[in-house]
């Protein structure tokens, strides 16, 4: 329990893939810090829904030699994809009243029964295109006002007219993950063999520090529906693709709130 070194599971270098050891440690909720004391290689793309854990690579190199092929056009097919779980409680409804800009009280049916501090993906119907929405964020309910209104941890950035269709979906986010101190080396080639270390979805307070990457395909760190996080002292040099849409980034942040990106650099890349 507590802190466990992956060498206890027979991982003494990149010759033996570290996938099974990582899966076993992540499956044990009593392990809160996983330490890698040697260079390591992974051959599978992992998805985790468990939080409250730190992955510390202690400055060693992470590779993905022989990794399983990625799905087409799937930037979330990282080596480590941490994700919360969307629930079955979905509420779709037209606004009965206009919503004011810079207002944190939101209309929602059955508000009196919504648990305090529960998390919801809150979005509005698009008026043009698919993603042109005034809101699509992961929000926390901080107060029940009455049977049809709650307060959330966000002040609305645009006014909405009555009749606009809102969708609230309950989410159990992944919380308090930290990945740190990694030298990542991706693969040459294209999308199938391309590799990148990290993706976070429906994530709260999930931080990344001191990840230095080269030769990635999709963003080194992809975030969607994240909030209250820090990305710091990370870098990317020489990604293998910068022309295809979405490639060649150090970090991409979609529908995110309250994040800090600081002391990060890129060289010969598409974007920070």
Residue spans of the language-model regions?
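Acidic Gly/Asp/Thr-rich repetitive segments characteristic of extracellular carbohydrate-active
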Residues: 6-37, 41, 110-115
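N-terminal extracellular ligand-recognition/capping segment immediately after the signal peptide
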Residues: 23, 30-76, 124-137, 154-164, ...
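Extracellular beta-strand solenoid repeats
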Residues: 5, 35, 41, 47, ...
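Ser/Thr/Gly-rich low-complexity blocks that favor extended beta-strand/coil architectures
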Residues: 91-95, 99-159
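Extracellular beta-strand-rich, repetitive "passenger/adhesive" scaffolds
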Residues: 1-3, 11, 28-39, 57-63, ...
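Short glycine/acidic-rich loop motifs that flank beta-strands on beta-rich extracellular proteins
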Residues: 44-46, 64-68, 188-196, 216-222, ...
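Right-handed parallel beta-helix
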Residues: 58-59, 175-186, 204-215, 226-241, ...
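Parallel beta-helix/beta-solenoid
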Residues: 58, 79-101, 112-124, 172-188, ...
């Amino acid at each position: 329990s507590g802190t466990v070194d992956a060498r206890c599971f027979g991982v003494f270098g990149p010759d033996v893939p570290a996938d099974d050891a990582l899966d076993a440690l992540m499956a044990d909720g009593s392990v809160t810090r996983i330490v890698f004391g040697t260079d390591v290689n992974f051959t599978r793309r992992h998805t985790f829904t468990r939080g409250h854990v730190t992955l510390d690579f202690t400055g060693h190199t992470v590779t993905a030699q022989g990794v399983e092929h990625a799905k087409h056009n799937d930037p979330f097919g990282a080596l480590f994809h941490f994700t919360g779980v969307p629930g079955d409680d979905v509420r779709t409804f037209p606004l009965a009243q206009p919503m004011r800009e810079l207002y944190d009280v939101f209309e929602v049916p059955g508000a009196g029964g919504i648990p305090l501090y529960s998390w919801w993906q809150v979005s509005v119907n698009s008026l043009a295109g698919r993603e042109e929405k005034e809101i699509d964020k992961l929000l926390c309910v901080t107060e029940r006002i009455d049977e049809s209104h709650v307060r959330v941890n966000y002040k609305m950035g645009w006014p909405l007219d009555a009749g606009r269709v809102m969708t609230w979906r309950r989410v159990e986010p992944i919380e308090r993950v930290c990945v740190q101190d990694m030298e990542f080396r991706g693969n040459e080639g294209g999308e199938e063999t391309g590799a990148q270390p990290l993706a976070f979805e429906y994530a709260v307070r999930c931080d990344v520090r001191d990840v230095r990457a080269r030769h990635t395909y999709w963003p080194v760190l992809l975030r969607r529906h994240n909030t209250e996080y820090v990305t710091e002292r990370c870098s990317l040099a020489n990604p293998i693709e910068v022309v295809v849409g979405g490639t060649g980034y150090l970090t991409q942040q979609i529908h995110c709130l309250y994040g800090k990106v600081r002391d990060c650099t890129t060289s010969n890349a598409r974007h920070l």
